From Swiss-Prot:
It holds the Pfam family Ribonuclease_P. The gene is rnpA. It catalyses: Endonucleolytic cleavage of RNA, removing 5'-extranucleotides from tRNA precursor. The keyword tRNA processing applies. Its EC number is 3.1.26.5. Keywords: Endonuclease, Hydrolase, Nuclease, RNA-binding, tRNA processing. GO terms for molecular function: 3'-tRNA processing endoribonuclease activity; ribonuclease P activity; tRNA binding. The lineage of its organism: Bacteria, Bacillati, Actinomycetota, Actinomycetes, Acidothermales. Coiled coil: none annotated. It comes from the Bacteria. This is Ribonuclease P protein component. PANTHER family: RIBONUCLEASE P PROTEIN COMPONENT. InterPro entries: Ribosomal_Su5_D2-typ_SF (IPR020568), Ribsml_uS5_D2-typ_fold_subgr (IPR014721), RNase_P (IPR000100), RNase_P_CS (IPR020539).
Length: 120
């Protein structure tokens, strides 16, 4: 379970991350990352699972899986960052392992520094 202090709750917070954040997309999810305006010490995460993903049972299952994936990786997410994870319709058919692997890959792409992207 993702502790409440690490969750994004207000729609204005979601909108700020979606507007100002960097974005990378995969087959199952889209991850947005932005710097927090507040002085909270840890990262915050929010989840968007729209009706195009499936019915209520499917959407809630995907949301629970995504929350569990992010909660297990709180130590890896940089402090004072906000993340929004948006599920795509293909996420309904994805396994937990596929969602976790894709989140790790996309988060890695977002958190790379410009120095590590240079040529050797």
């Amino acid at each position: 379970m993702l502790p409440s202090r690490y969750r994004l709750r207000r729609s204005s917070d979601f909108k700020a991350v979606l507007r100002r954040g960097r974005r990378v997309a995969g087959r199952y999810i889209v991850v947005y990352l932005s710097t927090s305006d507040t002085d909270r010490p840890g990262p915050q995460a929010g989840f968007v699972v729209g009706r195009n993903v499936g019915g209520a049972v499917v959407r809630n299952r995907i949301r629970r899986r995504l929350r569990h994936i992010v909660a297990a990786r709180l130590a890896v997410i940089p402090a004072r960052k906000r993340i929004v994870v948006r599920a795509l319709p293909a996420a309904a058919a994805a396994s937990f392992a596929e969602l976790a692997a894709e989140f790790d890959r996309l988060l890695g792409r977002l958190t790379q520094t410009k120095n590590s992207q240079g040529t050797s």
